[in-house]
Amino acid sequence: MSRSSDLFHKAQTIIPGGVNSPVRAFKGVGGEPVFFKSGKGAYLTDVDDKQYIDYVGSWGPLILGHCHPKVIEAVDNVLHSGMSFGAPTELEIQLAEKIASLMPSIEKIRMVNSGTEATMTAIRLARGFTNKNKFIKFNGCYHGHSDSLLVKAGSGLLTLGIPSTPGIPQSITEHTLTADFNNLEQVAQLFEKYPNDIATVILEPVPGNMGFILPKIEFLKGLRELCDQYNALLIFDEVMTGFRVGLHGAQGLFGIKPDITTLGKIIGGGMPVGALGGKREIMSFLAPEGPVYQAGTLSGNPLAMAAGLATLKEIEKINFFEDLSNATNKLTEALADAAENANIPFFAASLGGMFGFCFTDKNSVENYLDVASSDEVLFKKFFHAMLAQGVYFAPSMYEAGFVSSMHGDLEIQKTYDAAELVLNQLKSA
């Protein structure tokens, strides 16, 4: 028995399912999860001393790769000064100013501890500001695990085949309206049905928890117009896409200005973090300036602020995102070439340092149903065979993958070689 297997069995006796986040349990691909002990650059090393090229990147935060020296230095400096004070620090201001300088839609920002906290607070803020109750989300978009948002969500719910979750009374979700991503007509119909009671529309501008879905620009523009027409707020959940698909987030790439933006992952440089920001008059509704309450013991903690600030300083360097996008494109092209050589239907897409793929003969993937109809059995076989070759993709076909600045031509060539070998073996099996 491997040490990973031994640890997993031990973990199951004390931790529900043996993991602290469901997708880590490998339920989406079968088998047992790998336990890791270290990471450096583009690589992870497991507890059995096997090395892997890492395309998960802690689910997005590690855009600079594992243990980047600038991030380590920043955290180390703070570590010896105090990990948390429960009081204001200068680092909070510095990170807030840096984020606002890179995302013009953000005039004020509140730091929290996770993406879930950020989206939960954003919905509360939108309701408080507009004095309306209902909100629209999209099937397959994941906005954390707060009760009102865990309806037809993506991420682990899709991986586990759970359409929603027990433990949430219907009374809590009665104000949650859902529509299909990229379907503007459905959104318009909801606004027509509830013209005076929709507080906000929330979406991942580039969903990464129902596979990897690129938005239609007309869809995003239409959402902005509908929100303006009905005096509703537009929330971009950029916890995943913020500073990952481009220096100014998805909103910068597509030229759409949301009223509220939620952030996480990269702005903490690998530390637990979340944030919500937006127009001054909206953000001023948050306590203690306004009546909408939100608080957190570790919000704005120095370790996360230091790691996030160091990360943002690195990614704003000249050509960073051009190089990152090129590397991600090379990866998806390499995977597509390997699939084509094996005559296996395959679709891949990427944006910035984010990508996704599935085994399908469709020429485009536009929503959750397109991903769900792809060959999941083949994905599972591909995942495990690639893992055996030392390539670690997300253990679910519903999760996006991530490339860091440390993934170079060598790593992509190794990935291509492994994919070509694996896909030819699967084709002939």
Curated annotation (Swiss-Prot):
UniProt GO BP: protoporphyrinogen IX biosynthetic process
Q: Which InterPro entries match?
A: 4pyrrol_synth_GluAld_NH2Trfase (IPR004639), Aminotrans_3 (IPR005814), Aminotrans_3_PPA_site (IPR049704), PyrdxlP-dep_Trfase (IPR015424), PyrdxlP-dep_Trfase_major (IPR015421), PyrdxlP-dep_Trfase_small (IPR015422)
Could you list the residue ranges forming a coiled coil in this record?
none
The biological pathway it contributes to is: Porphyrin-containing compound metabolism; protoporphyrin-IX biosynthesis; 5-aminolevulinate from L-glutamyl-tRNA(Glu): step 2/2
- On this chain, the residues bearing N6-(pyridoxal phosphate)lysine are 265
Name any GO cellular component annotation. Answer: cytoplasm
> CDD domains, alphabetically?
OAT_like (cd00610)
Q: Does the keyword Cytoplasm apply?
A: yes
Q: How does it assemble?
A: Homodimer.
Q: What's the protein name? A: Glutamate-1-semialdehyde 2,1-aminomutase
Organism (species) = Legionella pneumophila (strain Corby)
**By which gene is this protein encoded?**
hemL
